[in-house]
Curated annotation (Swiss-Prot):
PROSITE patterns attached to this UniProt entry: DNA_MISMATCH_REPAIR_2
HAMAP family assigned: MutS (MF_00096)
Task performed by this protein: This protein is involved in the repair of mismatches in DNA. It is possible that it carries out the mismatch recognition step. This protein has a weak ATPase activity.
Molecular function as annotated in GO: ATP binding; ATP-dependent DNA damage sensor activity; damaged DNA binding; mismatched DNA binding
Protein name: DNA mismatch repair protein MutS
Keywords: ATP-binding, DNA damage, DNA repair, DNA-binding, Nucleotide-binding
Similarity comment: Belongs to the DNA mismatch repair MutS family.
Species per Swiss-Prot/TrEMBL record: Dinoroseobacter shibae (strain DSM 16493 / NCIMB 14021 / DFL 12)
Pfam family, one: MutS_IV
SMART domains: MUTSac, MUTSd
Regions that span the bilayer: none
InterPro entries reported for this sequence: DNA_mismatch_repair_MutS, DNA_mismatch_repair_MutS-lik_N, DNA_mismatch_repair_MutS/MSH, DNA_mismatch_repair_MutS_C, DNA_mismatch_repair_MutS_clamp, DNA_mismatch_repair_MutS_core, DNA_mismatch_repair_MutS_N, DNA_mismatch_repair_MutS_sf
Length: 877
């Protein structure tokens, strides 16, 4: 786009825009960020704001739209969520400075930041209880790695990640943005995980340049002290640091030293299993109904993020798991300490994100106050926790609360209790902290008092009681009176003292020599006070940055205590037990419950039926579960997988007792739907997920499979389910729960030593089925599908016909004939005519009341009351 025919300002805009062609340019003009040309058209549509015009270019109007600077963050969030990148261009000098270079000089402007989904730091742009990860995937020869960072908290990690595993780790981390080398074929995979895919030149992934970037970031000569990293690790980490240099324009965040994770140290959960188990979000995509929402009792933002990370990445390291369980047990056994810690934690702000904003020079007085308040509560906890008898997790956390007294005292002396959000507002430094500031404030405030006195004196001198001394940004201080009284002040002798400044429609404005002099004194004092406060803020900010590493450790310790005490409160309130996790192959659950379903049932006043599960080697590591739909098979499958995950994240579990041999992988194939975008039917999705399980599950895996083979013809489905179970038993040799409606498979329990039949119990009454939700040893005799269909509300004629068809099919199978042919030959004469519904049988009040009763839902007291009620109805009839 040519800049020859545009104004100097527009020429500057075009030059800056040329360097940021892939982003919307927020171009600062006074109190607004303006956008022009195509940026304006796109932004106006995305933000639903007015599209106007400003000047012409090549004889065409230039489209323009803008947003106020003070409200820009809200608009930024909308644009980022809609997939845009935004380059923020600020005025780097005052317009008065530009005018000194000539009347046509343009204010100097620079892009100070490139805002992308993975580089957000402002509180208003982030979810407080969720990480905001920026990830990078790098491949060097045969090795590949995934690195990720949250610049709002400083977390920085990397791990080896074969391309085949990338989907698993993207599902675990849920990054907002992923950096890829140009020319890759992974964009669609990244976008499937609802992350923005950003392609960079291959030079950005150069591992040699990465070492230089990392050494420069941490101020070290080499990276040996950080551990051993492969070239692919360095490539991924270097791409992230280079991208941060690009987007933050030289103001790099405070990143912790990179930590190398190892896949074998974590419980592996693939994307389909995470989705099916609804760990962090429900199948509908929201938080309601997810396991995380049900178990979250944290009271700090950093604690909530740590809990979410633990649930997404449970441990497979016995020592870590046991240390966490020991920490929860200590909290439960010391209720007074538990209450003290929780009380203190409720007053802890988000120190991590405050620290990050201060490091990037985007912070304000409230971020300093967040550091101060967090350190104050850390000191409270350091004093409250005993010096001995603390388990390792608690002792390590306490050790990080010391050594901050000097910084805490400095911030407590320097800041008022509730400082404003922005530095430019001033008024955040406490009185008595700085003598020069106190003097400037006194002069400023006294000057304002003098102004009030001058107004009274002017009113008396002129005899105009309504006279006012006012202020605006254009005239400064001025005297205002109505037009009615203006003639008096414009005439001698008052005109000798009162100098006319401005006439408006309703008033006339004046000034005096002494008012102008006082205005200068006030402005100078106010400006000096604000300048001093800004200088003090910078001194305090630097003091915080110097202590950043120790402050980050302190914040992590507070988060650790928040998580361990939150899990203790959860266990206490929900009656959860301490699981025993060891290196055996045991899986013994007594009285297990599904935490999310139990919470939902409690809300409706319905009790949850507890069930046992034993997949230990001494019993049978595979249970073949049969029973009708709606009986609770899927709930039983899921609850046992959730119990394993909760145990290995360090939580107590919803059971009366639990012993779990370490689980290395959890796989789930429950429920399916079409994948239209990739041309996959429900059955194809089911087969792909089943194939992944059979190909990947090791002997320490826990597998739950629900109704394999249901999406195809009966014998095809039975064959696939049969072969799948045999493979799990003979090849994978893992612990598994296998639910099916193929009752023919129950005979496998007699042939395969590691398979045992189990069923969900039901009762029949007058042709109806009653679900007991109890899992028992043995096989179901049938699936009760027709009864469930009746409960679902199918028309009576359809239910009646279904019973006839079922009877014919079952009798035909027993006789060895062709039941389907018999059905076709015996179609009703008027098959298309719906038979009239049977006449409703007259019912008495007693019969109607009996029909409404759900016996399993009655408490003993309710049952006794019901007996008296039924006796009364019987006597009446």
């Amino acid at each position: 786009m040519s800049s020859k025919t545009v104004t100097p300002m527009m020429a500057q805009y075009l030059e800056i825009k040329q360097d940021h062609a892939d982003a919307l340019l927020f171009y600062r003009m006074g109190d607004f960020y303006e956008m022009f040309f195509d940026d304006a058209v796109e932004a106006a549509a995305a933000l639903d704001i007015a599209l106007t015009k400003r000047g012409k270019h090549d004889d065409a109007d230039i489209p323009m739209c803008g947003v106020p600077v003070h409200a820009a963050e809200g608009y930024l969030l909308t644009l980022i969520r809609k997939g845009f990148r935004v380059a923020v261009c600020e005025q780097m000098e005052d317009p008065a400075e530009a005018k000194k270079r000539g009347s046509k000089s343009v204010v100097r402007r620079e892009v100070v930041r490139l805002v992308t989904p993975g580089t957000l730091t402002e509180a208003s742009l982030l979810e407080a209880r969720r990480h905001n990860y920026l990830a990078a995937f790098a491949k060097v020869r045969d090795d590949s790695a995934l690195a990720w960072v949250d610049i709002s908290t400083g977390e920085f990690r990397v791990m080896a990640c074969p391309a085949a595993r990338l989907s698993v780790d993207l599902a675990r981390l849920a990054p907002r943005e992923v950096l890829l080398a140009e020319g890759n074929d992974l964009r669609s995979l990244v976008e499937e995980h609802e992350a923005a895919a950003t392609e960079l030149g291959r030079a950005s992934f150069d591992s040699t340049a990465a070492v230089d970037r990392l050494c420069r970031l941490y101020g070290v000569a080499d990276l040996e002290a950080f551990g051993s990293f492969e070239r692919a690790d360095l490539s991924a980490m270097g791409a992230i640091v280079g991208y941060l240099e690009l987007t933050q324009k030289g103001k790099l965040p405070l990143l912790r030293k990179p930590v190398k994770e190892r896949a074998q140290h974590g419980l592996q959960i693939d994307a389909a299993t995470r989705r099916n188990l609804e760990l962090t979000q429900s199948l509908s995509g929201g938080r309601e109904g997810a396991l995380l929402t049900v178990i979250d009792r944290t009271v700090t933002a950093q604690g909530a993020r740590l809990l979410a990370r633990r649930l997404a990445s449970p441990s497979a390291d016995l020592s870590i798991i046991r240390t966490r369980h020991e920490g929860v047990r200590y909290a439960l056994e010391a209720p007074e300490i538990l209450d003290t810690v929780r009380t203190a934690l409720r007053q802890v702000p988000d120190m991590d994100r405050a620290l990050s904003r201060l490091a990037l020079d985007r912070g304000g007085p409230r971020d300093l106050a967040a550091i101060r308040n967090g350190l104050a509560q850390a000191a409270t906890l350091a004093e409250a926790l005993p010096d001995d008898a603390l388990p390792p997790l608690w002792a390590q956390s306490k050790s990080r609360f010391f050594g901050h007294d000097a910084l805490r005292d400095l911030l407590e002396k320097a800041l008022i209790a509730e400082p404003p959000l922005l530095t430019r507002d001033g008024g955040f430094v406490a009185s008595g902290y700085n003598v020069d500031l106190d003097e400037a404030r006194q002069l400023r405030d006294e000057g304002r008092g003098v102004i009030a006195g001058m107004q009274a004196e002017y009113a008396e001198a002129t005899g105009i009681a309504s006279l006012k001394v006012k202020h605006n940004n254009v005239l400064g201080y001025f005297i205002e009176t109505t037009a009615t009284h203006a003639d008096k002040m414009l005439s001698p002798p008052l005109s000798d003292r009162f100098i006319h400044r401005q006439t408006t429609a309703n008033a006339v404005r004046f000034t005096t020599v002494e008012l102008s002099e006082m205005e200068t004194r006030i402005l100078n004092a106010g400006g000096r006070a604000l300048a001093l406060e800004k200088s003090i803020f910078e001194e305090l900010r630097q003091a915080v940055i110097v202590a950043a590493a120790e402050l980050s450790d302190c914040a992590r310790a507070l988060a650790e205590l928040d998580v361990v005490t939150a899990l203790a409160v959860l266990a206490r309130d929900e009656d959860w037990c301490a699981p025993k996790v060891d290196d055996s192959r045991a899986f013994e659950i007594s009285g297990g419950r599904h935490p999310v379903v139990e919470a939902a049932l409690r809300a409706s006043g319905t009790p949850f039926i507890r069930n046992d599960c034993d997949l230990s080697e001494g019993a049978a590591p595979i249970w073949l579960l049969t029973g009708p739909n709606m009986a609770g098979k899927s709930t039983f499958l899921r609850q046992n997988a959730l119990i394993a995950i909760l145990a290995q994240m360090g939580s107590y579990v919803p059971a009366t007792a639990a012993r779990i041999g370490l689980v290395a992988q959890v796989f789930s194939r429950v429920g399916a739907s079409d994948d239209l975008a990739r041309g996959r039917s429900t059955f194809m999705v089911e087969m792909v997920e089943t194939a992944a399980i059979l190909n990947q599950a090791g002997d320490r895996a826990l597998v739950i499979l629900d109704e394999i083979g249901r999406g195809t013809a009966t014998y095809d489905g039975l064959s696939i389910a049969w072969a799948t179970l045999e493979h799990l038993h003979g090849v994978n040799r893992c612990r598994a729960l296998f639910a099916t409606h193929y009752h023919e498979m129950t005979g496998l329990a007699a042939q395969l030593s590691g398979v045992e039949n189990a069923t969900v119990a039901v009762k029949e009454h007058d042709g109806d089925v009653i679900f007991l939700h109890e899992v028992r040893r043995g096989a179901a005799d049938r699936s009760y599908g027709v009864q469930v269909a009746k409960l679902a509300g199918l028309p009576p004629s359809v239910v009646a016909r279904a019973r006839e068809v079922l009877k014919t099919l079952e009798s035909g199978e027993r006789s060895g004939g062709n039941p389907a042919k018999a059905l076709l030959e015996d179609l009703p004469l008027f098959a298309n005519a719906a038979p009239p519904p049977p006449p409703a049988a007259p019912t008495s009040a007693l019969e109607a009341r009996l029909a409404d009763i759900s016996p399993d839902a009655l408490s003993p007291r309710e049952a006794l009351d019901l007996v008296y009620e039924l006796k009364s109805l019987a006597d009446r009839d």
